[in-house]
Structure formats: structure tokens, C-alpha cells
Amino acid sequence: MKELLIIGIGGFIGAILRYVISGIIPAKFGIPTGTFIVNLIGSFIVGFVMYSSTVIDISPEYRLLIITGFCGALTTFSTFSYETFSLIENNEHIKFLTNIFINVMGCLIMIYVGRIMSLTILR
């Protein structure tokens, strides 16, 4: 029960932040920029926390709060999928491919950046 409350608190904060970021960042070049930004932020945080936990002790409760709760609500693959599918439905083939590429590559890069920053700061 304690774990569910911890996840819920993180999820509450992550969901609100996602709503705010998605609402204030308009689409650029026909690409859903808000979703892209929250996915980059979430990927960085996951990379940072997961690699930090290899150097310092991060309690399971904090990992649940940050990764499962906060990042789980902040980032969203379902919204990314819907928005990407909408681009292909509207025959926006270049935007469709661009959206997939920048989201996947951007998030992989942010995992790496989070890892590097974590290992640099904590050593």
C-alpha cells in the first residue's frame, strides 16, 4: 500500500507537469513539441537516476517515486503513438518520419546524457 501511495504522489506531480509543459509549448513545424519535450526530460531523469543508483544508494521508494510515478506520468508513449499516427493519417509522411526519429533518438541521447552527468557528478 505504501508503494502505491508513493507512485501516486510522483504520478500526480508528473501528470501536472506534463499538462503544463504540453499546454505552453506549441507545436513546431507540425510536430507535437510538448510531447517531445516531456519525453526528453523524462528520459534524462530516468538515465540520471538509474545510473546514479549504481554509484550511490537510492532507496527503492525514491526510485518508485521518481521513475515509476513521476516519469511514468510525465512521459507518454501512448500520446506519442497517437500523435504520430495522426500525422500519417493526414498524409504528413515527412513529419511522421521526423517525429519518430527525433523522439527515439532524442530520448536515447538523453538517457546517455543523464548517465554521463550522473557518473560525473557522483564520482
Curated annotation (Swiss-Prot):
GO molecular-function terms, A-Z: fluoride channel activity; metal ion binding
InterPro entries: FluC (IPR003691)
This protein's GO CC annotations: plasma membrane
TM stretches of this protein: 5-25, 29-49, 65-85, 94-114
Catalytic activity: fluoride(in) = fluoride(out)
Keyword Transmembrane helix among UniProt keywords: yes
Record text on activity regulation: Na(+) is not transported, but it plays an essential structural role and its presence is essential for fluoride channel function.
Membrane topology value: Multi-pass membrane protein
Keyword Metal-binding: yes
Cell compartment(s), UniProt: Cell membrane
Single GO BP term: cellular detoxification of fluoride
Main location as per UniProt: membrane
Ligand binding (Na(+)): 72, 75
Keywords: Cell membrane, Ion channel, Ion transport, Membrane, Metal-binding, Sodium, Transmembrane, Transmembrane helix, Transport
Function: Fluoride-specific ion channel. Important for reducing fluoride concentration in the cell, thus reducing its toxicity.
Similarity field: Belongs to the fluoride channel Fluc/FEX (TC 1.A.43) family.
HAMAP family (alphabetical): FluC
Protein name: Fluoride-specific ion channel FluC
Species per Swiss-Prot/TrEMBL record: Methanococcus aeolicus (strain ATCC BAA-1280 / DSM 17508 / OCM 812 / Nankai-3)
Gene name per UniProt: fluC
